[in-house]
A protein has these predicted regions:
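Juxtamembrane "stalk/linker" segments
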Residues: 1-34, 40-42
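Intrinsically disordered, low-complexity boundary segments flanking structured domains
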Residues: 14-21, 100-102, 133, 140-145
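Solvent-exposed alpha-helices and their adjacent loops that cap or buttress functional pockets
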Residues: 23-25, 103-106, 147-148
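Structural motif
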Residues: 30, 79-80, 111-112, 144-146, ...
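Flexible glycine-/small-residue-rich
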Residues: 32-38, 84, 104, 115-117, ...
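A solvent-exposed, charged loop/short amphipathic helix patch at secondary-structure junctions
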Residues: 46-54
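Soluble extracytoplasmic domains of inner/organellar membrane proteins
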Residues: 53-130
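Extracytoplasmic/luminal low-complexity segments enriched in Pro/Gly and acidic/polar residues
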Residues: 116-179
Length: 179
């Protein structure tokens, strides 16, 4: 029948698709642009903004993006992307050498984090929370370029790395049924 369990399951899957990252979404939110501090290249020793410290300190690190993204979720983000790569519960933000990798794809700078959330609460919840404080520290301590703007309409793509995994029942597992 048209109103059977299959239809209800399909409706539920469609309802969850935006938060699961399996479909593109549009809505108001934030754009956060992060870029390395001027003179922070690692090709020359001592080229960082603090000559007596690690030159990588003026560079955006994977952990910076991790902290910002995690706080966007905490603040109420409904969808998040980094440089156009939609994040899901299976996404990873990592370092590979000097490159930042998201969903196994290297990113170029600047790093643009886009997040969709409720306009009345989301921007303030992020700005007043740990993420807003962390961005201020990146700017003031490490001279990292930080720009946060509220957007009336953003479009985030569907994730290309979502895969469905499932389990099946195993019958007569040795030692489990008393045999």
């Amino acid at each position: 029948s048209a109103n059977g369990p299959g239809n209800a399951l399909s409706t539920r899957a469609n309802d969850l698709a935006p938060v699961a990252g399996t479909m593109a979404v549009r809505g108001p939110g934030l754009t956060i642009t992060l870029d390395d501090a001027e003179g922070s290249g690692t090709d020359t020793v001592g080229a960082g903004p603090r000559e007596d410290t690690n030159p990588a300190e003026g560079r955006v690190q994977a952990r910076d993006l991790q902290l910002v993204v995690n706080d966007l979720w905490r603040a109420g983000a409904q969808a998040v992307a980094v440089n156009g790569h939609r994040l899901t519960s299976m996404s990873a933000i990592r370092f590979a050498g000097a490159a930042i990798i998201v969903n196994y794809r290297p990113l170029g700078r600047p790093y643009i984090v886009t997040a969709i959330g409720t306009p009345k609460t989301f921007p303030a919840a992020f700005a007043q929370g740990p993420g807003g404080s962390y961005l201020a520290t990146l700017r003031s301590t490490f001279n990292i370029s930080v720009d946060v703007t509220t957007q009336g309409s953003l479009e985030l793509p569907a994730s290309v790395s979502v895969s469905t995994r499932y389990a099946t029942a195993v019958n007569n597992v040795s030692g489990k049924d008393g045999s």
